[in-house]
């Protein structure tokens, strides 16, 4: 199993990274330090997670201790929806760099295709509880992203939560300078994303799978929601390989040539999640796991369903 995937521009992206969405600021510094000590080199961040400063403390410490060199790390962050206006993109990126205490990012993504009204709130809502959109077009946002590459602030740029029609709009943009290197999307056995992944791969775009464990700690979980980690069918595959369900759920996207970013702040689990290079799921296991698709999303961003750029009305 390759430990890296190569982006179209030649950059090498570690296939396994540490996710930091929902990692409490008080715990994420130790989590990132533990991960780096265990061999993780890819850390997935975002401004909206409100913990980049604490992630930065960990990165700074490990760089200072010379546990790792900067060029061995692959640090990802994301532009939040309230900064889609072309004039705001560079400042948003610089805020993230400042918080992470870095002078460049390896990958910077447009977090969602939907632009929101600029201001202090991450989700500006109207009286009816719908998100207030900005009058921006993500093609203009993309031009500003390209500028970050030219200025040396970021090595690669990409998107997240974009459907194939939205990616196609970027690829067909007149005067396109850099195509998206990555599309980061929710992906697991209940949301297998076969068509979107096939599309991205056909365009030379690497796909990162987020919420590979089904995000059991999501704040809006309901008791009747399906649970990947408690699915006896997946547990049976894990038992056969003498592995945990989580390890099977992490190995599954890797064998589909996806990058995967499981989140944990628990040292034992951060370690467990990295022990996935010493076994292989059979083609039968893979087919079985793919058959569990039910188009079930953790992150449906329902407050934005009426936004002109809401990504999940399209089939893929």
Swiss-Prot record:
Residues at the catalytic site: 49
Reaction(s) the record says it catalyses: an alditol + NADP(+) = an aldose + NADPH + H(+); all-trans-retinol + NADP(+) = all-trans-retinal + NADPH + H(+); 9-cis-retinol + NADP(+) = 9-cis-retinal + NADPH + H(+); 13-cis-retinol + NADP(+) = 13-cis-retinal + NADPH + H(+)
GO cellular component terms attached to this protein's record: cytoplasm
Residue numbers bearing the N-acetylalanine modification: 2
EC number: 1.1.1.21, 1.1.1.300, 1.1.1.372, 1.1.1.54
Subcellular location, principal: cytoplasm
Alphabetized UniProt keyword annotations: Acetylation, Cytoplasm, Lipid metabolism, NADP, Oxidoreductase
GO MF, one example: allyl-alcohol dehydrogenase activity
Residue positions binding NADP(+): 10-19, 211-273
GO biological process terms on file: retinoid metabolic process
Subcellular location: Cytoplasm
Enzyme class label: oxidoreductase
Record-linked SUPFAM superfamilies: NAD(P)-linked oxidoreductase (SSF51430)
Keyword Nucleotide-binding: no
One Pfam family it belongs to: Aldo_ket_red
Function: Catalyzes the NADPH-dependent reduction of a wide variety of carbonyl-containing compounds to their corresponding alcohols with a broad range of catalytic efficiencies. Catalyzes the NADPH-dependent reduction of a wide variety of carbonyl-containing compounds to their corresponding alcohols. Displays enzymatic activity towards endogenous metabolites such as aromatic and aliphatic aldehydes, ketones, monosacharides, bile acids and xenobiotics substrates. Key enzyme in the polyol pathway, catalyzes reduction of glucose to sorbitol during hyperglycemia. Reduces steroids and their derivatives and prostaglandins. Displays low enzymatic activity toward all-trans-retinal, 9-cis-retinal, and 13-cis-retinal.
Subunit structure: Monomer.
Family under the similarity heading: Belongs to the aldo/keto reductase family.
Protein name: Aldo-keto reductase family 1 member B1
Organism: Oryctolagus cuniculus
